[in-house]
Protein backbone atom coordinates (compact mmCIF):
# COMPACT_ATOMS: atom_id res chain seq x y z
CA UNK A 1 0.00 0.00 0.00
CA UNK A 2 1.20 3.51 -0.80
CA UNK A 3 0.33 7.05 0.22
CA UNK A 4 0.33 9.75 -2.42
CA UNK A 5 0.76 13.23 -0.97
CA UNK A 6 -0.05 16.28 -3.07
CA UNK A 7 -1.12 19.87 -2.60
CA UNK A 8 -4.26 20.76 -4.55
CA UNK A 9 -6.27 23.95 -4.41
CA UNK A 10 -8.54 24.19 -1.41
CA UNK A 11 -12.08 22.94 -1.90
CA UNK A 12 -15.19 23.97 -0.05
CA UNK A 13 -16.46 21.66 2.66
CA UNK A 14 -19.88 21.59 1.05
CA UNK A 15 -18.55 20.22 -2.22
CA UNK A 16 -16.85 17.25 -0.60
CA UNK A 17 -20.08 15.70 0.63
CA UNK A 18 -21.19 14.50 -2.80
CA UNK A 19 -18.98 12.84 -5.39
CA UNK A 20 -19.39 10.44 -8.27
CA UNK A 21 -22.75 8.73 -8.73
CA UNK A 22 -24.18 10.48 -5.66
CA UNK A 23 -23.56 13.84 -7.29
CA UNK A 24 -25.15 12.67 -10.55
CA UNK A 25 -28.23 11.44 -8.66
CA UNK A 26 -28.42 14.77 -6.81
CA UNK A 27 -28.42 16.58 -10.18
CA UNK A 28 -31.34 14.45 -11.38
CA UNK A 29 -33.28 15.07 -8.17
CA UNK A 30 -32.87 18.85 -8.39
CA UNK A 31 -33.99 18.89 -12.04
CA UNK A 32 -36.98 16.70 -11.24
CA UNK A 33 -37.89 18.97 -8.33
CA UNK A 34 -37.89 21.93 -10.75
CA UNK A 35 -40.13 20.05 -13.23
CA UNK A 36 -37.55 19.75 -16.00
CA UNK A 37 -37.58 16.74 -18.30
CA UNK A 38 -34.18 15.09 -18.52
CA UNK A 39 -32.48 11.90 -19.55
CA UNK A 40 -29.38 10.11 -18.37
CA UNK A 41 -26.23 9.67 -20.47
CA UNK A 42 -24.14 6.86 -19.02
CA UNK A 43 -20.35 7.11 -18.98
CA UNK A 44 -20.05 3.35 -18.55
CA UNK A 45 -23.22 1.81 -20.03
CA UNK A 46 -22.75 -1.71 -18.65
CA UNK A 47 -26.34 -2.10 -17.47
CA UNK A 48 -25.15 -3.63 -14.20
CA UNK A 49 -23.34 -1.04 -12.10
CA UNK A 50 -24.08 2.58 -11.16
CA UNK A 51 -21.28 4.91 -12.15
CA UNK A 52 -21.35 8.70 -12.45
CA UNK A 53 -23.36 9.81 -15.50
CA UNK A 54 -24.17 12.94 -17.50
CA UNK A 55 -27.65 14.47 -17.32
CA UNK A 56 -29.19 16.16 -20.37
CA UNK A 57 -32.06 18.70 -20.50
CA UNK A 58 -33.32 19.57 -24.01
CA UNK A 59 -35.38 22.72 -24.58
CA UNK A 60 -37.17 22.80 -27.94
CA UNK A 61 -37.59 26.05 -29.93
CA UNK A 62 -40.51 28.23 -28.87
CA UNK A 63 -40.71 29.93 -32.29
CA UNK A 64 -41.24 28.26 -35.69
CA UNK A 65 -38.22 26.06 -36.29
CA UNK A 66 -35.54 27.27 -38.66
CA UNK A 67 -32.50 25.50 -40.02
CA UNK A 68 -30.27 26.17 -37.03
CA UNK A 69 -27.68 24.37 -35.00
CA UNK A 70 -28.49 23.14 -31.51
CA UNK A 71 -26.87 25.24 -28.80
CA UNK A 72 -25.15 23.04 -26.21
CA UNK A 73 -24.46 24.53 -22.78
CA UNK A 74 -22.22 22.35 -20.64
CA UNK A 75 -22.05 22.74 -16.87
CA UNK A 76 -20.10 20.44 -14.58
CA UNK A 77 -22.11 18.72 -11.86
CA UNK A 78 -19.60 20.05 -9.34
CA UNK A 79 -20.48 23.62 -10.34
CA UNK A 80 -24.18 22.76 -10.32
CA UNK A 81 -23.80 21.50 -6.76
CA UNK A 82 -22.21 24.82 -5.75
CA UNK A 83 -24.71 27.08 -7.55
CA UNK A 84 -27.96 25.11 -8.07
CA UNK A 85 -30.37 28.04 -7.75
CA UNK A 86 -28.53 30.28 -10.21
CA UNK A 87 -28.08 27.55 -12.82
CA UNK A 88 -31.67 26.30 -12.52
CA UNK A 89 -32.80 29.91 -12.91
CA UNK A 90 -30.80 30.14 -16.15
CA UNK A 91 -32.43 26.94 -17.45
CA UNK A 92 -35.88 28.28 -16.55
CA UNK A 93 -35.25 31.64 -18.25
CA UNK A 94 -33.92 29.89 -21.34
CA UNK A 95 -37.03 27.73 -21.47
CA UNK A 96 -39.24 30.85 -21.46
CA UNK A 97 -37.22 32.72 -24.09
CA UNK A 98 -38.56 33.18 -27.61
CA UNK A 99 -36.08 31.11 -29.57
CA UNK A 100 -35.92 29.68 -33.07
CA UNK A 101 -33.25 27.14 -32.12
CA UNK A 102 -33.06 24.24 -29.63
CA UNK A 103 -30.91 24.43 -26.50
CA UNK A 104 -29.49 21.49 -24.56
CA UNK A 105 -28.11 21.84 -21.06
CA UNK A 106 -25.66 19.05 -20.32
CA UNK A 107 -24.64 18.53 -16.69
CA UNK A 108 -21.38 16.65 -16.98
CA UNK A 109 -19.88 14.24 -14.47
CA UNK A 110 -16.23 13.97 -13.43
CA UNK A 111 -15.14 17.23 -15.03
CA UNK A 112 -13.24 18.57 -12.02
CA UNK A 113 -10.06 17.53 -13.78
CA UNK A 114 -7.05 16.75 -11.59
CA UNK A 115 -3.55 15.34 -11.97
CA UNK A 116 -3.30 13.32 -8.77
CA UNK A 117 -2.20 10.19 -10.57
CA UNK A 118 -0.26 11.19 -13.70
CA UNK A 119 0.79 7.63 -14.41
CA UNK A 120 -2.84 6.66 -15.12
CA UNK A 121 -4.27 8.60 -18.06
CA UNK A 122 -7.13 6.44 -19.27
CA UNK A 123 -9.99 7.85 -17.23
CA UNK A 124 -13.34 9.12 -18.45
CA UNK A 125 -14.73 12.63 -18.16
CA UNK A 126 -18.25 13.74 -18.88
CA UNK A 127 -17.46 16.44 -21.44
CA UNK A 128 -15.16 14.25 -23.54
CA UNK A 129 -17.59 11.33 -23.33
CA UNK A 130 -20.53 13.49 -24.42
CA UNK A 131 -18.63 15.06 -27.33
CA UNK A 132 -17.37 11.69 -28.53
CA UNK A 133 -20.91 10.29 -28.73
CA UNK A 134 -22.45 13.03 -30.89
CA UNK A 135 -23.72 11.66 -34.21
CA UNK A 136 -23.06 14.73 -36.38
CA UNK A 137 -20.95 17.53 -34.92
CA UNK A 138 -21.97 19.98 -37.66
CA UNK A 139 -25.47 20.15 -36.15
CA UNK A 140 -24.25 21.66 -32.87
CA UNK A 141 -22.20 24.42 -31.33
CA UNK A 142 -21.19 24.41 -27.68
CA UNK A 143 -20.70 26.88 -24.84
CA UNK A 144 -18.76 25.38 -21.94
CA UNK A 145 -18.98 27.17 -18.60
CA UNK A 146 -17.28 26.74 -15.28
CA UNK A 147 -16.77 28.74 -12.10
CA UNK A 148 -13.31 29.69 -10.95
CA UNK A 149 -12.20 29.22 -7.36
CA UNK A 150 -10.14 32.33 -7.50
CA UNK A 151 -11.60 35.65 -6.54
CA UNK A 152 -10.31 37.85 -9.35
CA UNK A 153 -12.92 40.21 -10.71
CA UNK A 154 -12.72 39.42 -14.41
CA UNK A 155 -14.43 36.59 -16.21
CA UNK A 156 -12.40 34.76 -18.86
CA UNK A 157 -13.26 33.76 -22.42
CA UNK A 158 -11.29 30.83 -23.89
CA UNK A 159 -11.15 30.54 -27.67
CA UNK A 160 -8.84 27.61 -28.43
CA UNK A 161 -8.92 23.87 -27.91
CA UNK A 162 -5.99 21.76 -28.99
CA UNK A 163 -4.84 23.37 -32.25
CA UNK A 164 -8.30 24.62 -33.24
CA UNK A 165 -9.93 27.95 -32.50
CA UNK A 166 -13.40 29.39 -32.00
CA UNK A 167 -14.93 30.92 -35.17
CA UNK A 168 -15.25 34.69 -35.26
CA UNK A 169 -19.06 34.76 -35.18
CA UNK A 170 -19.15 32.83 -31.90
CA UNK A 171 -16.34 34.84 -30.31
CA UNK A 172 -17.96 38.12 -31.40
CA UNK A 173 -21.40 37.22 -30.05
CA UNK A 174 -19.84 36.20 -26.75
CA UNK A 175 -17.71 39.34 -26.40
CA UNK A 176 -20.69 41.56 -27.29
CA UNK A 177 -22.77 39.81 -24.61
CA UNK A 178 -20.20 40.67 -21.94
CA UNK A 179 -19.80 44.25 -23.16
CA UNK A 180 -23.54 44.92 -23.26
CA UNK A 181 -23.81 43.79 -19.62
CA UNK A 182 -20.71 45.81 -18.62
CA UNK A 183 -19.07 42.68 -17.23
CA UNK A 184 -15.24 42.92 -17.19
CA UNK A 185 -13.54 40.03 -18.98
CA UNK A 186 -10.22 38.92 -20.38
CA UNK A 187 -9.28 36.66 -23.30
CA UNK A 188 -6.14 34.68 -22.32
CA UNK A 189 -5.92 33.00 -25.75
CA UNK A 190 -6.11 36.08 -28.01
CA UNK A 191 -2.97 35.02 -29.90
CA UNK A 192 -4.63 32.17 -31.79
CA UNK A 193 -1.71 31.59 -34.15
CA UNK A 194 0.47 30.15 -31.34
CA UNK A 195 -2.10 27.42 -30.75
CA UNK A 196 -2.77 26.69 -34.42
CA UNK A 197 0.98 26.27 -34.95
CA UNK A 198 1.02 23.59 -32.26
CA UNK A 199 3.39 25.54 -29.99
CA UNK A 200 0.70 25.56 -27.31
CA UNK A 201 -2.21 23.20 -26.69
CA UNK A 202 -5.55 24.84 -25.97
CA UNK A 203 -8.29 23.78 -23.59
CA UNK A 204 -8.67 19.97 -23.53
CA UNK A 205 -12.45 19.97 -23.14
CA UNK A 206 -12.85 22.32 -26.10
CA UNK A 207 -10.44 20.10 -28.05
CA UNK A 208 -12.85 17.18 -27.54
CA UNK A 209 -15.59 19.15 -29.33
CA UNK A 210 -13.36 20.49 -32.11
CA UNK A 211 -12.27 16.90 -32.77
CA UNK A 212 -15.90 16.03 -33.50
CA UNK A 213 -16.43 19.09 -35.74
CA UNK A 214 -18.36 21.07 -33.10
CA UNK A 215 -17.65 24.81 -32.91
CA UNK A 216 -17.29 25.87 -29.29
CA UNK A 217 -16.21 28.48 -26.76
CA UNK A 218 -15.55 28.33 -23.02
CA UNK A 219 -16.52 30.84 -20.32
CA UNK A 220 -15.03 30.93 -16.85
CA UNK A 221 -16.90 32.99 -14.28
CA UNK A 222 -15.27 34.27 -11.10
CA UNK A 223 -18.58 35.52 -9.70
CA UNK A 224 -21.97 33.88 -10.07
CA UNK A 225 -23.50 37.22 -11.13
CA UNK A 226 -21.45 37.07 -14.33
CA UNK A 227 -23.72 34.30 -15.60
CA UNK A 228 -26.02 37.08 -16.84
CA UNK A 229 -23.64 37.43 -19.82
CA UNK A 230 -24.51 33.87 -20.86
CA UNK A 231 -28.21 34.62 -20.47
CA UNK A 232 -27.72 37.66 -22.71
CA UNK A 233 -25.84 35.50 -25.23
CA UNK A 234 -28.69 32.98 -25.46
CA UNK A 235 -31.30 35.73 -25.73
CA UNK A 236 -29.54 37.54 -28.59
CA UNK A 237 -28.15 34.59 -30.55
CA UNK A 238 -28.89 34.86 -34.28
CA UNK A 239 -28.87 31.38 -35.90
CA UNK A 240 -28.06 32.61 -39.42
CA UNK A 241 -24.64 33.87 -38.32
CA UNK A 242 -23.32 30.43 -37.48
CA UNK A 243 -22.87 29.62 -41.19
CA UNK A 244 -19.61 31.63 -41.19
CA UNK A 245 -16.47 29.84 -40.10
CA UNK A 246 -13.76 32.53 -40.09
CA UNK A 247 -11.06 31.46 -37.61
CA UNK A 248 -8.29 33.77 -38.89
CA UNK A 249 -9.26 36.89 -37.01
CA UNK A 250 -8.03 39.17 -34.27
CA UNK A 251 -9.63 41.88 -32.17
CA UNK A 252 -8.81 44.71 -29.81
CA UNK A 253 -11.09 45.93 -27.03
CA UNK A 254 -10.81 49.59 -26.07
CA UNK A 255 -13.12 50.97 -23.39
CA UNK A 256 -16.50 49.46 -24.30
CA UNK A 257 -15.81 48.98 -28.01
CA UNK A 258 -14.25 46.09 -29.90
CA UNK A 259 -12.47 46.35 -33.24
CA UNK A 260 -12.43 43.13 -35.27
CA UNK A 261 -10.06 42.24 -38.10
CA UNK A 262 -11.50 39.35 -40.09
CA UNK A 263 -9.81 37.11 -42.64
CA UNK A 264 -10.82 39.29 -45.61
CA UNK A 265 -9.25 42.39 -44.04
CA UNK A 266 -6.09 40.45 -43.28
CA UNK A 267 -5.79 39.22 -46.88
CA UNK A 268 -6.43 42.71 -48.24
CA UNK A 269 -3.76 44.14 -45.93
CA UNK A 270 -1.22 41.55 -47.11
CA UNK A 271 -1.91 42.41 -50.76
CA UNK A 272 -1.55 46.16 -50.20
CA UNK A 273 1.56 45.63 -48.13
CA UNK A 274 3.05 43.42 -50.85
CA UNK A 275 2.80 46.25 -53.37
CA UNK A 276 4.47 48.67 -50.94
CA UNK A 277 7.29 46.22 -50.15
CA UNK A 278 8.07 45.70 -53.84
CA UNK A 279 8.10 49.47 -54.27
CA UNK A 280 10.50 49.97 -51.36
CA UNK A 281 12.84 47.13 -52.33
CA UNK A 282 13.01 47.67 -56.09
CA UNK A 283 12.54 51.40 -56.50
CA UNK A 284 14.03 52.95 -53.38
CA UNK A 285 16.90 50.64 -52.40
CA UNK A 286 19.14 51.58 -55.30
CA UNK A 287 18.37 55.31 -55.37
CA UNK A 288 20.17 58.28 -53.86
CA UNK A 289 23.70 59.58 -54.09
CA UNK A 290 25.24 56.18 -53.26
CA UNK A 291 23.15 54.23 -55.77
CA UNK A 292 26.09 53.28 -58.00
CA UNK A 293 28.13 51.95 -55.09
CA UNK A 294 25.05 50.13 -53.73
CA UNK A 295 24.46 48.42 -57.08
CA UNK A 296 28.12 47.48 -57.29
CA UNK A 297 28.13 46.00 -53.76
CA UNK A 298 24.96 44.04 -54.42
CA UNK A 299 26.15 42.59 -57.74
CA UNK A 300 29.42 41.45 -56.17
CA UNK A 301 28.14 40.08 -52.86
CA UNK A 302 24.53 38.92 -53.35
CA UNK A 303 25.62 35.32 -52.62
CA UNK A 304 26.48 36.53 -49.15
CA UNK A 305 22.72 36.64 -48.32
CA UNK A 306 22.02 32.86 -48.60
CA UNK A 307 25.41 32.19 -46.96
CA UNK A 308 24.35 34.22 -43.92
CA UNK A 309 21.01 32.41 -43.77
CA UNK A 310 22.80 29.06 -43.79
CA UNK A 311 25.12 30.29 -41.05
CA UNK A 312 22.09 31.32 -39.00
CA UNK A 313 20.50 27.86 -39.28
CA UNK A 314 23.85 26.21 -38.54
CA UNK A 315 24.27 28.33 -35.40
CA UNK A 316 20.96 27.00 -34.03
CA UNK A 317 22.05 23.40 -34.61
CA UNK A 318 25.28 24.11 -32.71
CA UNK A 319 23.26 25.59 -29.84
CA UNK A 320 20.94 22.61 -29.93
CA UNK A 321 23.86 20.19 -29.75
CA UNK A 322 25.32 21.98 -26.72
CA UNK A 323 21.96 22.01 -24.91
CA UNK A 324 21.72 18.26 -25.34
CA UNK A 325 25.29 17.29 -24.46
CA UNK A 326 26.41 19.80 -21.82
CA UNK A 327 25.12 18.56 -18.46
CA UNK A 328 24.85 21.97 -16.78
CA UNK A 329 22.54 23.11 -19.61
CA UNK A 330 20.56 19.92 -20.20
CA UNK A 331 19.63 19.72 -16.50
CA UNK A 332 18.32 23.31 -16.37
CA UNK A 333 14.65 24.21 -16.81
CA UNK A 334 13.38 24.51 -20.41
CA UNK A 335 13.42 28.33 -20.45
CA UNK A 336 17.11 28.40 -19.50
CA UNK A 337 17.87 25.73 -22.12
CA UNK A 338 16.19 27.75 -24.86
CA UNK A 339 18.04 30.89 -23.75
CA UNK A 340 21.30 28.93 -23.88
CA UNK A 341 20.51 27.82 -27.43
CA UNK A 342 20.02 31.45 -28.46
CA UNK A 343 23.20 32.58 -26.72
CA UNK A 344 25.31 29.88 -28.38
CA UNK A 345 23.77 30.93 -31.70
CA UNK A 346 24.99 34.50 -31.03
CA UNK A 347 28.51 33.18 -30.34
CA UNK A 348 28.53 31.23 -33.62
CA UNK A 349 27.34 34.27 -35.58
CA UNK A 350 30.08 36.32 -33.90
CA UNK A 351 32.67 33.77 -35.01
CA UNK A 352 31.21 34.05 -38.51
CA UNK A 353 31.84 37.81 -38.32
CA UNK A 354 35.49 37.17 -37.44
CA UNK A 355 35.67 34.83 -40.42
CA UNK A 356 34.38 37.65 -42.64
CA UNK A 357 36.98 40.07 -41.31
CA UNK A 358 39.80 37.59 -41.68
CA UNK A 359 38.92 36.85 -45.32
CA UNK A 360 38.13 40.52 -45.99
CA UNK A 361 34.57 39.71 -47.02
CA UNK A 362 32.01 42.54 -47.16
CA UNK A 363 31.08 44.04 -43.82
CA UNK A 364 29.46 47.23 -45.12
CA UNK A 365 26.29 48.68 -43.62
CA UNK A 366 24.55 48.56 -47.01
CA UNK A 367 24.93 44.78 -47.40
CA UNK A 368 23.66 44.16 -43.88
CA UNK A 369 20.87 46.72 -44.29
CA UNK A 370 19.67 45.20 -47.55
CA UNK A 371 19.77 41.68 -46.09
CA UNK A 372 17.70 42.61 -43.06
CA UNK A 373 15.04 44.41 -45.15
CA UNK A 374 14.87 41.56 -47.67
CA UNK A 375 14.51 38.82 -45.04
CA UNK A 376 12.03 40.77 -42.90
CA UNK A 377 9.89 41.34 -46.01
CA UNK A 378 10.12 37.65 -46.93
CA UNK A 379 9.11 36.72 -43.37
CA UNK A 380 5.86 38.63 -43.74
CA UNK A 381 4.73 36.52 -46.67
CA UNK A 382 6.19 33.20 -45.50
CA UNK A 383 4.61 33.34 -42.06
CA UNK A 384 1.36 34.86 -43.35
CA UNK A 385 1.00 31.84 -45.62
CA UNK A 386 1.15 29.64 -42.51
CA UNK A 387 -1.24 31.85 -40.49
CA UNK A 388 -2.43 35.17 -41.84
CA UNK A 389 -3.08 36.65 -38.39
CA UNK A 390 0.68 36.98 -37.73
CA UNK A 391 0.91 39.43 -40.65
CA UNK A 392 0.59 42.41 -38.32
CA UNK A 393 3.49 41.28 -36.13
CA UNK A 394 5.96 40.90 -38.98
CA UNK A 395 4.62 43.98 -40.78
CA UNK A 396 5.29 46.09 -37.69
CA UNK A 397 8.78 44.62 -37.43
CA UNK A 398 9.38 45.44 -41.10
CA UNK A 399 8.39 49.09 -40.66
CA UNK A 400 10.66 49.40 -37.61
CA UNK A 401 13.53 47.93 -39.62
CA UNK A 402 12.82 50.08 -42.67
CA UNK A 403 12.65 53.38 -40.82
CA UNK A 404 15.78 52.60 -38.77
CA UNK A 405 17.72 51.11 -41.68
CA UNK A 406 20.12 54.05 -41.90
CA UNK A 407 21.03 53.88 -38.22
CA UNK A 408 24.79 53.82 -37.87
CA UNK A 409 25.52 55.09 -34.39
CA UNK A 410 25.83 52.52 -31.64
CA UNK A 411 23.01 53.94 -29.50
CA UNK A 412 20.60 54.12 -32.44
CA UNK A 413 21.40 50.50 -33.37
CA UNK A 414 20.66 49.36 -29.80
CA UNK A 415 17.39 51.31 -29.84
CA UNK A 416 16.51 49.74 -33.20
CA UNK A 417 17.23 46.27 -31.80
CA UNK A 418 14.99 46.96 -28.78
CA UNK A 419 12.13 48.28 -30.93
CA UNK A 420 12.28 45.17 -33.11
CA UNK A 421 11.60 43.06 -30.03
CA UNK A 422 8.35 44.86 -29.17
CA UNK A 423 6.01 43.09 -31.66
CA UNK A 424 7.09 39.68 -30.31
CA UNK A 425 6.99 40.35 -26.55
CA UNK A 426 3.30 39.47 -26.14
CA UNK A 427 3.87 36.15 -27.96
CA UNK A 428 6.88 35.34 -25.78
CA UNK A 429 4.96 36.16 -22.58
CA UNK A 430 1.90 34.11 -23.57
CA UNK A 431 4.01 31.18 -24.74
CA UNK A 432 6.17 30.79 -21.65
CA UNK A 433 3.23 31.44 -19.32
CA UNK A 434 1.28 28.51 -20.77
CA UNK A 435 3.75 26.03 -22.25
CA UNK A 436 4.40 22.67 -20.61
CA UNK A 437 7.95 21.39 -20.19
CA UNK A 438 7.60 18.55 -22.78
CA UNK A 439 6.11 20.93 -25.37
CA UNK A 440 8.93 23.48 -25.15
CA UNK A 441 11.34 20.76 -26.30
CA UNK A 442 10.14 21.47 -29.84
CA UNK A 443 12.17 24.71 -29.69
CA UNK A 444 15.19 23.17 -27.96
CA UNK A 445 15.58 19.84 -29.79
CA UNK A 446 14.21 21.03 -33.11
CA UNK A 447 13.95 19.42 -36.49
CA UNK A 448 14.95 21.06 -39.76
CA UNK A 449 11.63 22.83 -40.31
CA UNK A 450 11.48 24.40 -36.83
CA UNK A 451 15.13 25.51 -36.95
CA UNK A 452 14.63 27.17 -40.34
CA UNK A 453 11.57 29.03 -39.03
CA UNK A 454 13.45 30.07 -35.89
CA UNK A 455 16.35 31.20 -38.04
CA UNK A 456 14.10 33.38 -40.20
CA UNK A 457 12.66 35.02 -37.09
CA UNK A 458 16.07 35.53 -35.49
CA UNK A 459 17.89 36.57 -38.67
CA UNK A 460 16.97 40.30 -38.56
CA UNK A 461 18.19 40.46 -34.95
CA UNK A 462 21.41 38.68 -35.87
CA UNK A 463 22.04 41.17 -38.68
CA UNK A 464 21.55 44.13 -36.33
CA UNK A 465 24.03 42.42 -34.02
CA UNK A 466 26.56 42.24 -36.87
CA UNK A 467 25.91 45.91 -37.67
CA UNK A 468 26.74 46.67 -34.03
CA UNK A 469 30.02 44.76 -34.41
CA UNK A 470 30.80 46.72 -37.56
CA UNK A 471 30.10 49.94 -35.69
CA UNK A 472 32.39 48.91 -32.81
CA UNK A 473 35.12 48.36 -35.35
CA UNK A 474 34.57 51.82 -36.85
CA UNK A 475 34.56 53.45 -33.41
CA UNK A 476 38.15 52.35 -32.94
CA UNK A 477 39.03 54.30 -36.12
CA UNK A 478 41.58 51.67 -36.98
CA UNK A 479 40.22 49.40 -39.65
CA UNK A 480 43.49 47.51 -39.74
CA UNK A 481 43.06 46.18 -36.21
CA UNK A 482 44.51 42.74 -35.68
CA UNK A 483 42.17 39.79 -35.69
CA UNK A 484 43.01 39.23 -32.02
CA UNK A 485 41.79 42.70 -31.02
CA UNK A 486 38.68 42.39 -33.16
CA UNK A 487 37.97 39.04 -31.51
CA UNK A 488 38.33 40.71 -28.12
CA UNK A 489 35.79 43.40 -28.95
CA UNK A 490 33.48 40.81 -30.47
CA UNK A 491 33.43 38.48 -27.48
CA UNK A 492 33.11 41.32 -24.97
CA UNK A 493 30.04 42.42 -26.92
CA UNK A 494 28.80 38.81 -27.00
CA UNK A 495 29.21 38.67 -23.22
CA UNK A 496 26.95 41.70 -22.91
CA UNK A 497 24.36 39.98 -25.12
CA UNK A 498 24.72 36.85 -22.97
CA UNK A 499 24.01 38.91 -19.86
CA UNK A 500 20.88 40.36 -21.48
CA UNK A 501 19.64 36.90 -22.57
CA UNK A 502 20.39 35.45 -19.11
CA UNK A 503 18.51 38.29 -17.41
CA UNK A 504 15.57 37.78 -19.76
CA UNK A 505 15.56 34.01 -19.09
CA UNK A 506 15.72 34.60 -15.32
CA UNK A 507 12.85 37.11 -15.33
CA UNK A 508 10.77 34.88 -17.61
CA UNK A 509 11.40 31.85 -15.39
CA UNK A 510 10.79 33.69 -12.13
CA UNK A 511 7.73 35.75 -13.01
CA UNK A 512 6.11 33.91 -15.93
CA UNK A 513 7.09 30.23 -16.30
CA UNK A 514 7.31 29.34 -12.58
CA UNK A 515 3.97 31.01 -11.84
CA UNK A 516 2.35 28.42 -14.08
CA UNK A 517 4.54 25.40 -13.36
CA UNK A 518 5.64 25.85 -9.76
CA UNK A 519 3.67 22.96 -8.28
CA UNK A 520 5.01 20.22 -6.09
CA UNK A 521 5.03 16.75 -7.59
CA UNK A 522 3.15 13.94 -5.86
CA UNK A 523 5.19 11.87 -3.41
CA UNK A 524 4.64 8.15 -2.91
CA UNK A 525 5.36 6.88 0.61
CA UNK A 526 5.36 3.18 1.51
CA UNK A 527 3.04 2.22 4.36
CA UNK A 528 1.12 -0.82 5.56
CA UNK A 529 -2.47 -0.63 6.80
CA UNK A 530 -5.51 -2.87 6.54
CA UNK A 531 -6.58 -3.86 3.04
CA UNK A 532 -9.56 -2.22 1.36
CA UNK A 533 -9.36 -3.87 -2.07
CA UNK A 534 -10.32 -7.47 -2.91
CA UNK A 535 -10.44 -9.05 -6.38
CA UNK A 536 -11.39 -12.46 -7.75
CA UNK A 537 -11.66 -13.95 -11.25
CA UNK A 538 -14.11 -16.61 -12.46
CA UNK A 539 -13.41 -18.32 -15.80
CA UNK A 540 -15.68 -20.26 -18.15
CA UNK A 541 -14.34 -22.30 -21.12
CA UNK A 542 -17.68 -23.68 -22.30
CA UNK A 543 -17.65 -21.62 -25.52
CA UNK A 544 -14.98 -21.16 -28.22
CA UNK A 545 -13.47 -18.35 -26.15
CA UNK A 546 -12.67 -18.10 -22.49
CA UNK A 547 -15.23 -15.91 -20.70
CA UNK A 548 -14.06 -14.28 -17.49
CA UNK A 549 -15.69 -12.26 -14.73
CA UNK A 550 -13.50 -10.00 -12.61
CA UNK A 551 -15.19 -9.16 -9.31
CA UNK A 552 -13.86 -6.05 -7.59
CA UNK A 553 -14.88 -5.33 -4.00
CA UNK A 554 -13.83 -2.41 -1.88
CA UNK A 555 -14.45 -1.69 1.79
CA UNK A 556 -14.83 2.02 1.10
CA UNK A 557 -15.38 4.41 -1.79
CA UNK A 558 -12.40 4.67 -4.13
CA UNK A 559 -11.50 7.92 -5.84
CA UNK A 560 -10.17 6.11 -8.89
CA UNK A 561 -9.77 2.52 -10.00
CA UNK A 562 -7.55 1.37 -12.85
CA UNK A 563 -7.72 -2.10 -14.39
CA UNK A 564 -5.32 -3.49 -16.95
CA UNK A 565 -4.78 -6.96 -18.36
CA UNK A 566 -1.49 -7.97 -19.95
CA UNK A 567 -0.52 -11.09 -21.86
CA UNK A 568 2.86 -12.02 -23.23
CA UNK A 569 1.37 -14.27 -25.90
CA UNK A 570 -1.76 -12.96 -27.63
CA UNK A 571 -4.13 -10.01 -27.63
CA UNK A 572 -5.10 -9.77 -23.95
CA UNK A 573 -8.83 -8.94 -24.42
CA UNK A 574 -11.14 -9.67 -27.35
CA UNK A 575 -14.40 -8.27 -25.97
CA UNK A 576 -15.76 -6.72 -22.78
CA UNK A 577 -18.81 -5.01 -21.31
CA UNK A 578 -16.52 -2.05 -20.47
CA UNK A 579 -14.67 0.08 -22.97
CA UNK A 580 -10.94 -0.52 -23.07
CA UNK A 581 -7.85 0.56 -24.95
CA UNK A 582 -5.26 -1.86 -26.31
CA UNK A 583 -1.89 -0.16 -25.95
CA UNK A 584 0.76 0.13 -28.65
CA UNK A 585 2.42 -3.16 -27.86
CA UNK A 586 -0.99 -4.87 -28.35
CA UNK A 587 -0.31 -7.05 -25.32
CA UNK A 588 -1.83 -4.80 -22.65
CA UNK A 589 -5.45 -3.66 -22.37
CA UNK A 590 -6.36 -0.68 -20.19
CA UNK A 591 -10.01 -0.38 -19.12
CA UNK A 592 -11.80 2.96 -18.98
CA UNK A 593 -13.32 2.97 -15.50
CA UNK A 594 -15.04 6.23 -14.48
CA UNK A 595 -13.83 7.81 -11.25
CA UNK A 596 -15.72 7.13 -8.00
CA UNK A 597 -16.75 3.61 -9.06
CA UNK A 598 -19.22 1.50 -7.02
CA UNK A 599 -17.69 -0.33 -4.08
CA UNK A 600 -18.67 -3.63 -5.73
CA UNK A 601 -18.67 -4.11 -9.51
CA UNK A 602 -17.84 -6.71 -12.14
CA UNK A 603 -15.97 -6.59 -15.43
CA UNK A 604 -16.83 -9.25 -17.97
CA UNK A 605 -14.34 -9.96 -20.74
CA UNK A 606 -13.38 -12.71 -23.15
CA UNK A 607 -9.96 -13.93 -24.25
CA UNK A 608 -8.49 -16.69 -26.34
CA UNK A 609 -8.25 -20.06 -24.62
CA UNK A 610 -4.92 -21.28 -23.34
CA UNK A 611 -3.70 -17.70 -22.86
CA UNK A 612 -1.98 -16.78 -19.62
CA UNK A 613 -2.42 -13.22 -18.41
CA UNK A 614 -1.87 -10.90 -15.47
CA UNK A 615 -4.77 -8.79 -14.21
CA UNK A 616 -3.75 -5.70 -12.24
CA UNK A 617 -6.27 -3.61 -10.28
CA UNK A 618 -5.21 -0.38 -8.58
CA UNK A 619 -7.50 1.72 -6.37
CA UNK A 620 -6.94 5.12 -4.78
CA UNK A 621 -8.64 6.17 -1.54
CA UNK A 622 -8.97 9.35 0.46
CA UNK A 623 -7.72 9.41 4.05
CA UNK A 624 -8.52 11.51 7.11
CA UNK A 625 -5.95 14.01 5.90
CA UNK A 626 -7.28 15.90 2.88
CA UNK A 627 -3.81 15.95 1.31
CA UNK A 628 -3.22 12.18 1.42
CA UNK A 629 -4.42 9.36 -0.80
CA UNK A 630 -3.93 5.65 -0.30
CA UNK A 631 -2.99 3.46 -3.21
CA UNK A 632 -3.67 -0.29 -3.21
CA UNK A 633 -2.74 -2.71 -5.98
CA UNK A 634 -3.86 -6.31 -6.46
CA UNK A 635 -2.31 -8.49 -9.19
CA UNK A 636 -3.76 -11.86 -10.22
CA UNK A 637 -2.02 -14.36 -12.47
CA UNK A 638 -4.44 -16.35 -14.65
CA UNK A 639 -3.00 -19.54 -16.10
CA UNK A 640 -3.64 -20.50 -19.70
CA UNK A 641 -4.62 -24.00 -18.59
CA UNK A 642 -8.21 -25.14 -18.92
CA UNK A 643 -10.54 -23.42 -16.45
CA UNK A 644 -11.71 -25.61 -13.63
For each feature predicted by the language model, list its residue ranges.
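Polar/charged alpha-helical tracts
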Residues: 29-32, 89, 232, 236, ...
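Context-gated lysine
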Residues: 14-15, 19, 33, 69, ...
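Acidic-enriched, low-complexity/disordered segments with a strong bias for Aspartate over Glutamate
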Residues: 35, 49, 79, 104, ...
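Detector for Asparagine
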Residues: 2, 48, 54-56, 114-115, ...
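Soluble extramembrane regions of membrane proteins in the secretory/endomembrane system
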Residues: 1-259
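Extracytosolic and intramembrane catalytic regions of membrane-associated proteins
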Residues: 21-59, 67-68, 520-644
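Transmembrane catalytic cores of multi-pass membrane glycosyltransferases
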Residues: 242-252, 259-279, 319
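Alpha-helical transmembrane segments of integral membrane proteins
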Residues: 268-574, 578-579, 605-607, 611-615, ...
